[in-house]
């Protein structure tokens, strides 16, 4: 499943295609959304927001399309008039004069008013988004030490969207390697330096992934390109200590780590 950085890049692509352009055609597959089709024609997308793995497409008439891709949903951008060859089932079409965005295969799709945005069950449940530029390490540290989270093992906590939205398995693995901790550690057992390092890594790692993953221009990014240090690298030597990276299962997900420097 895509994690926060991939969802945010998808949102960027949707914005680049249709933001600010009048909608010339709107289509929804689900009957409960059909009545919104005519209400959105002539309106425009003001921005596309991410809340963890959910996408909020905001329209100029104050309605918001909520969508969660789950395992199979995917957004595509096409030239208007183009019909992609795919076996996926179309759920949403938002068309402008030159570009159209299409949502396939997703099942969790709703239209929300401003009031419903504040009471939506999923949006109420998720924690702060790691890609929110206003989220600081200090706030993350407060959450780590809160009664709700301080006794949780990191193996499960870093996958819990109620703690921080946008984290997933590859980020869990890479963050814990960065700070030399294991999935069995808990916030309540860390010293001040470890807590500080973890709070920063919980933001720095996903933000670096979002900003540079897939980029190759090391001059532009000063060598700080995101790449996997342990994820999918079991059997290889750890670049930090030379130990052999191992693979196990934690919280029902594959977990990669180096026993030589994560303890």
From Swiss-Prot:
A biological process (GO) of this protein is: base-excision repair
Q: What is this protein called?
A: Endonuclease 8
Cross-referenced NCBIfam families: PRK10445.1
Q: What is the documented function of this protein? A: Involved in base excision repair of DNA damaged by oxidation or by mutagenic agents. Acts as a DNA glycosylase that recognizes and removes damaged bases. Has a preference for oxidized pyrimidines, such as thymine glycol, 5,6-dihydrouracil and 5,6-dihydrothymine. Has AP (apurinic/apyrimidinic) lyase activity and introduces nicks in the DNA strand. Cleaves the DNA backbone by beta-delta elimination to generate a single-strand break at the site of the removed base with both 3'- and 5'-phosphates.
Disulfide-bond pairs as recorded: none
A Pfam family that this protein carries is Fapy_DNA_glyco
* Annotated SMART domains: Fapy_DNA_glyco, H2TH
Q: What is its EC number?
A: 3.2.2.-, 4.2.99.18
Q: Where are the zinc fingers (FPG-type)?
A: 229-263
Q: Which residues form the active site?
A: 2 (schiff-base intermediate with dna), 3 (proton donor), 53 (proton donor), 253 (proton donor)
């Amino acid at each position: 499943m895509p994690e926060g950085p991939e969802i945010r890049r998808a949102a960027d692509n949707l914005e680049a295609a249709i933001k600010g352009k009048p909608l010339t055609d709107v289509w929804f597959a689900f009957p409960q959304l059909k009545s919104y089709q005519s209400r959105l024609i002539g309106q425009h997308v003001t921005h596309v927001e991410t809340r963890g793995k959910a996408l909020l497409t905001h329209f100029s008439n104050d309605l918001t399309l909520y969508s969660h891709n789950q395992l199979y949903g995917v957004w595509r951008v096409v030239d208007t008039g183009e019909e992609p060859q795919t076996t996926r089932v179309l759920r949403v079409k938002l068309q402008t004069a030159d570009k159209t965005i299409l949502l396939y295969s997703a099942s969790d799709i709703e239209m929300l008013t401003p009031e419903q945005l504040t009471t939506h069950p999923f949006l109420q449940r998720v924690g702060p988004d790691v890609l929110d530029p206003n989220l600081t390490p200090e706030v993350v540290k407060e959450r780590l030490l809160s009664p709700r989270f301080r006794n949780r093992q990191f193996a499960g906590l870093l996958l819990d969207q109620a703690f921080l939205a946008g984290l997933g398995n590859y980020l869990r693995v890479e963050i814990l390697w960065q700070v030399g901790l294991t999935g069995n550690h808990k916030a309540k057992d860390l010293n001040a330096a470890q807590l500080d390092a973890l709070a920063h890594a919980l933001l720095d790692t996903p933000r670096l992934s979002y900003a540079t993953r897939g980029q190759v221009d090391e001059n532009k990014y000063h060598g700080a390109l995101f790449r996997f240090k342990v994820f999918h690298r079991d059997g290889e030597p750890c670049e930090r200590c030379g130990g052999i990276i191992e693979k196990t299962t934690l919280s029902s997900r594959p977990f990669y780590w180096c026993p030589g420097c994560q303890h």
